[in-house]
């Protein structure tokens, strides 16, 4: 395995993120530099990408590369895009435009590749026992990826088109305001239906539910803001219910000031928390463990084998 430094860029629906890292021989990732840009390329007005998606993504990539040079003079950039580009009619042409602007090729990941790389990254977290049966999920703006695996290998994956941006756009009338009881009830029923259709009557047995993505980070910070107990990176099922009610029945300003939700996520966090809560309920998971190791870590590991 090479020790070459890799700048992994993940163009998501709601944010664009990077990791400058190096794959270690033991399967872990040495993190050198990370950054997140709140650049939403997925439109809140209609399905698809915002008109300036290529310019937003190209600017972020260039800024990431410039910052990475402060840490490493030699690195290779690998950029990927997920469901926002995968589902957009102009996804490939937008990826081509990004290359024409900044010179970095963007690979649009299929559902299986996104799930596989995300799971690979999560299992590189030394705090997670990858030998045990594990369910991993990553909730983004465009989709929910759920992976069942054991022994560090993916066994089964599901990609559900219920990302927080998509669901908010479709079902919440004014996402900056507090939800009505009817809106929350609708979200609850909608996600129950989605989970039932996805998993059916039986769910494979597992030991640990592991979650990644901005929505889980937001839940972790909100849990801390409320002073809820337990491990710092562990959220119980009951705590997730408390967090869901907390962010739904207040406006976006309170979500930011009282519950530590980042400004770029205050409009979509009710849908995100409702999705996580419904997933935990369907799986029968008493808790979830958050990991910062994710798709970008998997991308560094994959690139390190090339």
Regions found by a protein language model. Give the residues of each.
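A generic, well-ordered mixed alpha/beta core segment in the N-terminal half of proteins
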Residues: 135-143, 147
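Short beta-strand scaffold segments in enzyme catalytic cores
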Residues: 16-20, 144-148, 298-299
């Amino acid at each position: 395995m090479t020790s070459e430094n890799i700048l992994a860029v993940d163009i998501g629906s709601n944010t664009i993120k990077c990791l400058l890292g190096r794959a270690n021989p033991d399967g872990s990732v040495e993190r050198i530099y990370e950054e997140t840009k709140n650049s939403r390329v997925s439109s809140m007005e209609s399905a698809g990408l915002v008109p300036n998606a290529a310019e937003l993504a190209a600017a972020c990539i260039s800024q990431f590369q410039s910052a990475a040079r402060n840490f490493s003079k030699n690195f290779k950039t690998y950029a990927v895009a997920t469901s926002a580009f995968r589902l957009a009619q102009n996804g490939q042409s937008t990826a081509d435009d990004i290359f024409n602007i900044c010179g970095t090729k963007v690979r649009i990941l299929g559902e299986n590749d996104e799930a596989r790389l995300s799971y690979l990254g999560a299992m590189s977290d030394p705090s997670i026992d990858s030998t045990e049966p594990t369910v991993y999920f990553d909730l983004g703006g465009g989709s929910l990826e759920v992976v069942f695996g054991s022994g560090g290998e993916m066994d089964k994956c599901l990609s559900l088109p219920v990302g927080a941006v998509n669901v908010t756009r479709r079902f919440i009338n004014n996402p900056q305001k507090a939800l009505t009881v009817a809106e929350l009830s609708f979200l609850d029923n909608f996600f129950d239906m989605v989970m039932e259709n996805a998993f059916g009557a039986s769910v494979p047995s597992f030991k640990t539910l592991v979650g990644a993505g901005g929505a889980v980070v937001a839940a972790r910070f909100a849990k801390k803001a409320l002073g809820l107990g337990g491990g710092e990176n562990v959220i119980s099922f009951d705590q997730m219910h408390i967090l869901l009610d907390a962010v739904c029945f207040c406006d976006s300003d309170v979500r930011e000031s009282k519950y530590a939700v980042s400004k770029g996520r205050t409009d979509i966090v009710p849908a995100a928390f409702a999705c996580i809560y419904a997933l935990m309920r369907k799986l029968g998971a008493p808790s979830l463990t958050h990991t910062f190791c994710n798709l970008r870590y998997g991308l560094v590991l994959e690139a390190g084998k090339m």
